[in-house]
């Protein structure tokens, strides 16, 4: 099976996508006027087992579009399945079949409702033919095509004589996706999760490179990456525009999809914590387990990737002050606390200054998760905690996402998550989150092998936790005003000197 360059989407198809894209949950730009500009398109072959007769086979096309607007220049992936508009009628009971067209992707679940119909789709599809347009991330024909063209860590084996390692039976697109689209494929390679990336980063995606490096280390706390799809282009395809000058060695490749093992019986960490909070059940033991796993993750990352120099304390505090000042000017609630916030940074600077004269007293910069919270971990009775989604902030360049950072920033992300779980789960009192935080931090510190002393680690965690809480106050005030009290309570607690 091959992946090949093909024609860009037609103007008729782009008109359809212009209306459809902004309504998607994963669409990365909200409330900002942007243009959708076709950039690159790739055609995929559909395996014979995933289609009907060859004349009726669907077309699978991956379109990369640039989103251009005031201060916006992003790339999104739009995988599409194009089916002939006069396909055979669906069998009784087929759900969401477009205009009487039966799903053409074999044993997988029927695709969702189509985007619409076009006479000219571009992307190598025959002009003048009526095409029914589907979101490829929700269509089995696209799943089959992605699996067939992906690079596999090892060739998938069938489960037995006559079985298909690419069995799409029971496959379903998940409805909870946020920045990407996820598909559960229980019949593929023993059970897998296919992630179709939406906001595309130029360069190696850390959600591929980091889990692969961890798996090579033998670290079992991450779902094993099994396959991935990467595309490339040459210099003539580089996006043109202001600020787009590229160094000769700049990457001209991007990952479009990732297949990882499915953690059977696992539960989302945030949902689990909310359930415990709602029942008034202590989360301390699970929080302590998570602290140990996170310390082990950071140690594995230090083994797998280069470790930098110790953080410059003066630079760090100056950067945190800068971010803090931006938050204070953006929030009236924080503005009323400006004096206390400034005093907090003064105290932090003084604490860290006292240790800068001691060699290696401050933690070294290293590869980290970068966007860690309880929603990025899974828990299963058989496996314990698994860490997911090393992609980082999808809208930031890969070079920024993979820049060495403080491991304690990941710690601060989990610490902040406990407050949200307590609030969303309606914990009976503040003690629930206090106990969870204390158990998590104590277990992390005991298991951590970075060699940072308690006082320094505590000061850094407090500083990084306040930094995150300040960001959350601004975010909630703009997007979910009813939630603003959650991070604001943490700000007050930290300013008062409490953990």
Predicted regions and their residues:
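An alpha-helical support segment within catalytic cores of ATP-dependent transferases
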Residues: 159-170, 327-367
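All-alpha amphipathic helical-bundle segments outside canonical DNA-binding/catalytic cores
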Residues: 285, 311, 451-464
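Exposed beta-strand-loop-beta-strand "reactive/processing" segments of non-cytosolic proteins
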Residues: 34-79
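Conserved protein kinase catalytic/activation segment
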Residues: 376-387
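Conserved catalytic-loop position in the HRD/HxD motif
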Residues: 371
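Conserved ATP-binding subdomain of kinase catalytic cores across diverse folds
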Residues: 68-325, 383, 393-424
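Active-site activation/catalytic loop segments of kinase-like enzymes and analogous catalytic loops
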Residues: 392-448, 466-483
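Short Lys/Arg-enriched alpha/beta "domain-start" segment
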Residues: 1-46
């Amino acid at each position: 099976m091959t992946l090949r360059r093909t024609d860009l989407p037609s103007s008729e198809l782009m008109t359809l996508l212009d209306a459809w894209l902004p309504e998607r949950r994963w669409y990365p730009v909200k409330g900002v006027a942007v243009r959708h500009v076709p950039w690159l398109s790739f055609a995929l072959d559909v395996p014979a087992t995933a289609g009907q007769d060859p004349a009726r086979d669907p077309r699978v096309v991956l379109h990369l579009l640039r989103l251009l607007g005031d201060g916006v220049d992003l790339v999104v992936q739009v995988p599409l399945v194009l089916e002939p508009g006069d396909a055979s009628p669906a069998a009784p009971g087929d759900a969401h079949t477009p205009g009487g067209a039966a799903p053409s992707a074999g044993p997988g679940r029927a695709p969702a409702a189509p985007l619409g119909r076009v006479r000219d789709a571009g992307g190598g599809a025959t002009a003048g033919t009526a095409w029914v347009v589907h979101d490829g991330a929700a269509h089995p024909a696209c799943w089959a095509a992605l699996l067939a063209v992906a690079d596999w860590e090892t060739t998938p084996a069938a489960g037995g004589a006559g079985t298909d390692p690419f069995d799409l039976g029971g496959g379903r697109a998940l409805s909870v996706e946020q920045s990407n689209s996820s598909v559960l494929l229980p019949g593929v390679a023993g059970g897998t999760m296919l992630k179709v990336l939406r906001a595309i980063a130029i360069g190696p995606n850390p959600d591929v490179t980091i889990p692969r490096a961890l798996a090579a280390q033998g670290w079992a706390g991450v779902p094993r990456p099994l396959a991935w799809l990467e595309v490339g282009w040459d210099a003539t395809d580089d996006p043109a525009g202001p600020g787009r000058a590229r160094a000769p060695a700049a990457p001209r490749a991007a990952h479009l999809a990732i297949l990882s093992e499915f953690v059977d019986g696992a539960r989302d960490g945030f949902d689990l914590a909310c359930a415990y909070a709602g029942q008034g059940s202590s989360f301390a033991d699970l929080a302590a387990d998570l602290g140990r796993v996170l310390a082990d993750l950071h140690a594995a990352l230090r083994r797998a990737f280069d470790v930098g120099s110790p953080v410059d304390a003066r630079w760090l505090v100056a950067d945190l002050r800068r971010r803090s000042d931006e938050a204070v000017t953006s929030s009236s609630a924080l503005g009323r606390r400006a004096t206390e916030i400034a005093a907090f940074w003064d105290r932090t600077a003084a604490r860290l200054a006292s240790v800068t004269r001691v060699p290696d007293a401050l933690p070294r910069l290293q590869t980290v998760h970068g966007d860690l919270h309880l929603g990025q971990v899974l828990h299963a009775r058989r496996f314990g905690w698994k860490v997911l989604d090393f992609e980082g902030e999808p809208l930031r360049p890969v070079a920024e996402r993979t820049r060495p950072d403080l491991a304690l920033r990941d710690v601060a992300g989990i610490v902040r998550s406990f407050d949200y779980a307590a609030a969303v789960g309606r914990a009976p009192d503040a003690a629930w989150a206090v106990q969870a935080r204390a158990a998590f931090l104590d277990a992390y510190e005991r298991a951590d092998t970075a060699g940072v002393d308690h006082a320094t680690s505590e000061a850094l965690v407090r500083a990084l936790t306040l930094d995150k809480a300040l960001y959350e106050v601004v975010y909630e005030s703009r997007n979910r005003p009813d939630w603003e009290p959650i991070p604001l309570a943490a700000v007050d607690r930290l300013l008062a000197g409490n953990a």
